[in-house]
Protein backbone atom coordinates (compact mmCIF):
# COMPACT_ATOMS: atom_id res chain seq x y z
CA UNK A 1 0.00 0.00 0.00
CA UNK A 2 2.80 2.40 0.88
CA UNK A 3 4.60 1.69 -2.41
CA UNK A 4 1.37 2.22 -4.34
CA UNK A 5 0.82 5.46 -2.48
CA UNK A 6 4.29 6.72 -3.45
CA UNK A 7 3.68 5.78 -7.07
CA UNK A 8 0.37 7.62 -7.14
CA UNK A 9 1.90 10.72 -5.58
CA UNK A 10 4.65 10.67 -8.19
CA UNK A 11 2.34 10.49 -11.23
CA UNK A 12 3.00 13.51 -13.48
CA UNK A 13 -0.50 13.40 -15.02
CA UNK A 14 -3.95 12.53 -13.74
CA UNK A 15 -6.96 11.40 -15.71
CA UNK A 16 -9.32 14.29 -16.37
CA UNK A 17 -11.98 14.83 -13.70
CA UNK A 18 -10.29 12.25 -11.48
CA UNK A 19 -9.73 12.73 -7.78
CA UNK A 20 -6.37 12.15 -6.11
CA UNK A 21 -6.65 9.42 -3.48
CA UNK A 22 -4.42 9.51 -0.43
CA UNK A 23 -4.10 5.82 0.44
CA UNK A 24 -2.71 6.47 3.90
CA UNK A 25 -5.55 8.80 4.87
CA UNK A 26 -8.46 7.38 2.89
CA UNK A 27 -7.88 3.67 2.36
CA UNK A 28 -5.78 2.28 5.21
CA UNK A 29 -8.02 3.57 8.04
CA UNK A 30 -11.00 1.95 6.33
CA UNK A 31 -9.28 -1.42 6.34
CA UNK A 32 -8.34 -1.07 10.00
CA UNK A 33 -11.86 -0.02 11.00
CA UNK A 34 -13.41 -2.95 9.15
CA UNK A 35 -11.05 -5.35 10.87
CA UNK A 36 -11.85 -4.01 14.30
CA UNK A 37 -15.59 -3.45 13.91
CA UNK A 38 -16.49 -7.01 14.87
CA UNK A 39 -14.90 -6.53 18.29
CA UNK A 40 -16.22 -3.01 18.74
CA UNK A 41 -19.90 -3.90 18.90
CA UNK A 42 -22.36 -6.61 19.90
CA UNK A 43 -23.82 -8.77 17.14
CA UNK A 44 -24.92 -12.33 16.50
CA UNK A 45 -21.36 -13.43 15.86
CA UNK A 46 -20.19 -12.12 19.25
CA UNK A 47 -23.04 -13.86 21.04
CA UNK A 48 -22.30 -17.16 19.31
CA UNK A 49 -18.68 -17.01 20.47
CA UNK A 50 -19.33 -16.10 24.12
CA UNK A 51 -18.97 -19.73 25.35
CA UNK A 52 -15.40 -19.73 24.05
CA UNK A 53 -14.87 -16.30 25.56
CA UNK A 54 -15.93 -17.68 28.93
CA UNK A 55 -13.22 -20.32 28.66
CA UNK A 56 -10.61 -17.66 27.87
CA UNK A 57 -11.85 -15.48 30.73
CA UNK A 58 -11.70 -18.44 33.14
CA UNK A 59 -8.11 -19.25 32.24
CA UNK A 60 -7.06 -15.61 32.52
CA UNK A 61 -8.77 -15.15 35.89
CA UNK A 62 -7.27 -18.39 37.21
CA UNK A 63 -3.76 -17.32 36.22
CA UNK A 64 -4.19 -13.85 37.72
CA UNK A 65 -5.48 -15.34 40.97
CA UNK A 66 -3.09 -18.22 41.56
CA UNK A 67 0.06 -17.40 39.60
CA UNK A 68 1.49 -14.11 40.77
CA UNK A 69 4.67 -12.99 38.96
CA UNK A 70 7.69 -12.67 41.22
CA UNK A 71 9.88 -9.61 41.55
CA UNK A 72 13.62 -9.72 40.92
CA UNK A 73 15.84 -10.72 43.80
CA UNK A 74 18.78 -8.65 44.95
CA UNK A 75 21.56 -8.92 42.39
CA UNK A 76 19.24 -9.86 39.54
CA UNK A 77 18.65 -7.60 36.56
CA UNK A 78 15.41 -5.60 37.00
CA UNK A 79 12.66 -6.22 34.47
CA UNK A 80 10.11 -3.81 32.98
CA UNK A 81 7.12 -5.40 31.24
CA UNK A 82 5.17 -3.43 28.62
CA UNK A 83 1.91 -5.04 27.54
CA UNK A 84 -1.81 -4.60 27.09
CA UNK A 85 -5.09 -6.26 27.98
CA UNK A 86 -6.39 -6.22 24.40
CA UNK A 87 -5.02 -7.81 21.25
CA UNK A 88 -3.57 -5.88 18.36
CA UNK A 89 -0.97 -3.19 17.95
CA UNK A 90 -1.52 -0.58 20.64
CA UNK A 91 1.89 1.07 20.52
CA UNK A 92 3.92 -1.34 22.65
CA UNK A 93 6.92 -1.59 20.35
CA UNK A 94 7.62 2.15 19.85
CA UNK A 95 7.06 2.71 23.57
CA UNK A 96 9.52 -0.06 24.47
CA UNK A 97 12.06 1.39 22.08
CA UNK A 98 11.69 4.89 23.54
CA UNK A 99 11.99 3.61 27.12
CA UNK A 100 15.13 1.69 26.17
CA UNK A 101 16.58 4.77 24.48
CA UNK A 102 15.85 6.97 27.50
CA UNK A 103 17.42 4.42 29.84
CA UNK A 104 20.47 4.21 27.59
CA UNK A 105 20.83 8.00 27.69
CA UNK A 106 20.71 7.80 31.48
CA UNK A 107 23.68 5.43 31.50
CA UNK A 108 21.89 2.06 31.69
CA UNK A 109 22.52 -0.88 29.39
CA UNK A 110 19.01 -1.99 28.41
CA UNK A 111 18.18 -5.26 26.71
CA UNK A 112 14.90 -6.26 25.11
CA UNK A 113 13.08 -9.59 25.03
CA UNK A 114 10.09 -10.42 22.87
CA UNK A 115 8.26 -13.23 21.16
CA UNK A 116 9.36 -12.54 17.61
CA UNK A 117 5.89 -12.16 16.14
CA UNK A 118 5.58 -13.65 12.62
CA UNK A 119 9.16 -14.94 12.77
CA UNK A 120 9.93 -18.49 11.69
CA UNK A 121 12.61 -19.16 14.32
CA UNK A 122 11.74 -21.45 17.22
CA UNK A 123 13.83 -21.56 20.37
CA UNK A 124 16.06 -18.84 21.78
CA UNK A 125 17.78 -16.35 19.49
CA UNK A 126 20.12 -13.46 20.26
CA UNK A 127 19.62 -11.13 17.31
CA UNK A 128 22.78 -10.26 15.37
CA UNK A 129 23.80 -8.60 12.10
CA UNK A 130 22.99 -11.74 10.12
CA UNK A 131 19.51 -12.22 11.59
CA UNK A 132 16.60 -11.52 9.25
CA UNK A 133 13.07 -10.28 9.87
CA UNK A 134 11.83 -13.54 8.36
CA UNK A 135 13.48 -15.38 11.26
CA UNK A 136 12.57 -13.16 14.20
CA UNK A 137 9.95 -10.69 12.96
CA UNK A 138 10.07 -6.98 12.17
CA UNK A 139 9.83 -5.81 15.78
CA UNK A 140 13.01 -7.60 16.86
CA UNK A 141 14.96 -6.15 13.93
CA UNK A 142 13.56 -2.69 14.70
CA UNK A 143 14.90 -2.85 18.27
CA UNK A 144 18.25 -4.31 17.17
CA UNK A 145 18.78 -1.60 14.56
CA UNK A 146 18.40 1.00 17.30
CA UNK A 147 21.43 -0.48 19.06
CA UNK A 148 19.91 -2.75 21.71
CA UNK A 149 20.64 -6.34 22.66
CA UNK A 150 17.56 -8.34 21.67
CA UNK A 151 16.59 -11.92 22.48
CA UNK A 152 13.65 -13.63 20.82
CA UNK A 153 11.84 -16.55 22.46
CA UNK A 154 8.20 -17.45 22.95
CA UNK A 155 9.17 -18.35 26.52
CA UNK A 156 9.88 -14.91 27.99
CA UNK A 157 11.45 -16.29 31.18
CA UNK A 158 13.90 -18.32 29.10
CA UNK A 159 14.63 -15.27 26.93
CA UNK A 160 15.39 -13.25 30.06
CA UNK A 161 17.74 -15.91 31.40
CA UNK A 162 19.58 -16.11 28.08
CA UNK A 163 19.93 -12.33 27.85
CA UNK A 164 21.34 -12.13 31.37
CA UNK A 165 23.92 -14.84 30.69
CA UNK A 166 25.09 -13.64 27.30
CA UNK A 167 25.06 -9.83 27.45
CA UNK A 168 26.08 -7.05 29.82
CA UNK A 169 22.55 -5.63 30.14
CA UNK A 170 21.70 -4.23 33.55
CA UNK A 171 17.99 -3.71 32.88
CA UNK A 172 15.57 -5.65 30.66
CA UNK A 173 12.37 -4.56 28.92
CA UNK A 174 9.84 -7.11 27.75
CA UNK A 175 7.99 -6.09 24.59
CA UNK A 176 4.67 -7.72 25.48
CA UNK A 177 4.61 -10.38 28.19
CA UNK A 178 2.03 -8.99 30.62
CA UNK A 179 0.22 -12.35 30.60
CA UNK A 180 3.40 -14.42 31.03
CA UNK A 181 3.25 -15.01 34.78
CA UNK A 182 6.46 -17.07 34.76
CA UNK A 183 8.38 -13.93 33.81
CA UNK A 184 9.54 -12.00 36.86
CA UNK A 185 8.98 -8.28 36.75
CA UNK A 186 9.59 -5.17 38.83
CA UNK A 187 7.54 -2.62 36.90
CA UNK A 188 4.47 -3.16 34.74
CA UNK A 189 3.19 -0.80 32.05
CA UNK A 190 -0.09 -1.26 30.19
CA UNK A 191 -0.69 0.74 27.01
CA UNK A 192 -4.04 0.87 25.23
CA UNK A 193 -5.60 2.72 22.30
CA UNK A 194 -7.84 5.44 23.75
CA UNK A 195 -9.81 5.73 20.50
CA UNK A 196 -10.63 2.06 20.37
CA UNK A 197 -11.03 1.72 24.13
CA UNK A 198 -11.75 -1.90 25.14
CA UNK A 199 -14.13 -2.59 22.28
CA UNK A 200 -17.20 -4.56 23.31
CA UNK A 201 -15.35 -5.58 26.53
CA UNK A 202 -15.64 -9.28 25.73
CA UNK A 203 -12.80 -11.80 25.87
CA UNK A 204 -11.38 -13.52 22.82
CA UNK A 205 -12.67 -14.63 20.42
CA UNK A 206 -15.93 -12.67 20.86
CA UNK A 207 -14.06 -9.48 21.76
CA UNK A 208 -10.56 -7.99 21.90
CA UNK A 209 -9.76 -8.72 25.56
CA UNK A 210 -7.02 -11.15 26.49
CA UNK A 211 -6.88 -10.06 30.11
CA UNK A 212 -9.24 -8.56 32.68
CA UNK A 213 -9.83 -4.81 32.41
CA UNK A 214 -9.26 -4.44 36.15
CA UNK A 215 -5.63 -5.35 35.45
CA UNK A 216 -5.14 -1.75 34.33
CA UNK A 217 -5.68 -0.65 37.95
CA UNK A 218 -3.10 -3.11 39.28
CA UNK A 219 -0.12 -2.17 37.13
CA UNK A 220 2.44 0.52 37.93
CA UNK A 221 1.64 2.69 34.91
CA UNK A 222 -1.37 2.77 32.58
CA UNK A 223 -0.91 4.71 29.34
CA UNK A 224 -4.24 5.36 27.67
Where are these regions (language model features)?
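Conserved small/polar residues in nucleotide/adenosyl-binding loops
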Residues: 1-4
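A residue-level signal for conserved active-site and pocket-lining positions in enzyme catalytic cores
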Residues: 55, 93, 143
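A transmembrane-helix-recognition feature enriched in membrane-embedded lipid enzymes
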Residues: 31-78
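Residues lining hydrophobic/aromatic ligand-binding pockets adjacent to catalytic sites
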Residues: 52, 111, 224
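Short Gly/Ser/Thr- and charged-rich N-terminal loops/segments
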Residues: 9-12, 16
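Walker A (P-loop) phosphate-binding motif
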Residues: 65-126
